[in-house]
Regions:
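A transmembrane-helix-recognition feature enriched in membrane-embedded lipid enzymes
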Residues: 186-210
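N-terminal type II signal-anchor transmembrane helix
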Residues: 2-38
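A short, flexible N-terminal coil/short beta segment enriched in small residues
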Residues: 1-17, 71-72, 81-90
């Protein structure tokens, strides 16, 4: 009986230890997620735009923002054509423009859309393209929607690319994205996304400590 009681006590202590570790681990993972998910407060803007990588989640957020500020232009960052695009064009293959079609279904008119050439469409290219747009449109406020895991790194890159003396850009994260700071480690998809972004953010701080 004593052995049984002792064994149960050991199991209880071990179980309590595991339960104590799990909340601490989850708290650390949530804190790690919040490092990535940096977001400004939404403000009225002259141009609202989503980065290339945020996909439908970013476009849904654009739709919400445009309903509250219908006079704002909607920016679409357009990566340059690739060899694959050229080959499809040569063969007469025309793919639907899903971005423009989704914006139309969200109630955004074609004449409200501003197309902005964005090089290869990565973070460096899109932030540089937006910086050039800001330089060409002084006094205009720009609001950019990005994926949550991309928030801090994109905001840092955009501020570096932004012209001095112009209204600072606003960067907010898409609430419809799969990545959430509260539970990103519970899905392989978001775990992969989070780890990749943590690595990229660390590299960004190494290259640009300020």
């Amino acid at each position: 009986m004593r052995r049984l009681v002792r064994a149960l006590a050991i199991v209880a202590v071990m179980g309590a230890g595991v339960l104590a570790i799990a909340p601490a681990r989850h708290a650390a993972l949530r804190s790690t997620g919040r490092i990535l998910v940096a977001s400004d407060q939404p403000q009225p803007a002259d141009l609202i735009v989503t980065d290339v990588e945020s996909g439908p989640a970013g476009l849904l957020t654009i739709g919400d923002l445009h309903r509250s500020q219908p006079n704002a232009a909607v920016g679409v960052l357009v990566p340059r054509a690739t060899r694959i695009d050229a080959e499809m064009q040569q063969r007469g293959i025309v793919l639907p423009n899903l971005t423009v079609e989704m914006l139309a279904q969200l109630g955004i008119r074609e004449d409200a859309i501003v197309r902005i050439p964005a090089g290869e469409g990565g973070t460096s290219e899109t932030t540089r393209a937006l910086g050039e747009w800001g330089r060409s449109n002084p006094g205009k406020r720009v609001l950019v929607v990005v994926g949550p895991s991309h928030g801090r790194r994109y905001r840092r890159a955009l501020r570096r690319a932004w012209p001095d003396g112009h209204l600072a850009p606003i960067v907010i994260t898409a609430p419809y994205a799969l990545f959430r700071a509260e539970d990103w480690w519970q899905s392989r998809t978001t775990v992969r996304e989070g780890l990749v972004e943590l690595e990229k953010l660390a590299l960004d701080y190494a290259r640009h400590p300020w």
